[in-house]
Structure formats: structure tokens, C-alpha cells
Amino acid sequence: MSDEPEHTAKVEPLRKPLPCPECGHPSHREHYPFCSDRCRTQDLSRWLKGSYAIPVAEDESNPDDDGRF
């Protein structure tokens, strides 16, 4: 074995770190798009509690009513 340094390729990340949607710190690959498991769990908790909601347009027609009667 020689004492020469090993030549290794520089690995570029697949995507640039974006700010964590919870706290603003740079995201990490393991928890993308979050920076940590804590932020990821906190976001999941908000979804499960119903803090986030996807808006739905109210439609007054009944989808089960096919107009036969």
C-alpha cells in the first residue's frame, strides 16, 4: 500500500437544499423537504389534526340523484 491520497470523485447532491417549510433551515436529504425528523413529524401532525385543508367548492347537486324520479 502506498501513502498516496486516494482520488475520489466529488459527488454532487441530487437537488440543492431548500429551506425547511417548518423552520427555514436548509433541508437534508434524509428528511426532504424538511431539515429534521422533528419538522417532518410536526408537519404530519398538523395534517392529521386537520390544521391543513384542501379547499373544496360546494356543489348543491346530489351526486346520487340521477334525475329519474
Swiss-Prot record:
Listed A to Z, the keywords are:
Metal-binding, Zinc
Q: What does this protein do?
A: Inhibits all the catalytic activities of DNA gyrase by preventing its interaction with DNA. Acts by binding directly to the C-terminal domain of GyrB, which probably disrupts DNA binding by the gyrase.
Sequence similarity: Belongs to the DNA gyrase inhibitor YacG family.
Q: What is this protein called?
A: DNA gyrase inhibitor YacG
Q: NCBIfam families attached here?
A: PRK01343.1
Q: Where does Zn(2+) bind?
A: C20, C23, C35, C39
Q: Which residues cross the membrane?
A: none
Record GO terms (molecular function)? DNA topoisomerase type II (double strand cut, ATP-hydrolyzing) inhibitor activity; zinc ion binding
For this chain's record, the cofactor binding note is:
Binds 1 zinc ion.
Subunit organization: Interacts with GyrB.
| Region feature (Disordered) | 1-22
Question: Coiled-coil stretches, from where to where?
Answer: none
Record has Zinc as a keyword = yes
Q: Which PANTHER family match?
A: DNA GYRASE INHIBITOR YACG
Annotated organism of origin: Allorhizobium ampelinum (strain ATCC BAA-846 / DSM 112012 / S4)
Where is this chain compositionally biased, Basic and acidic residues type?
A: 1-15
In the UniProt record, the gene name given for this protein reads: yacG
Q: Which cofactor does it need?
A: Zn(2+)
Q: Which GO terms describe its biological process?
A: regulation of DNA-templated transcription
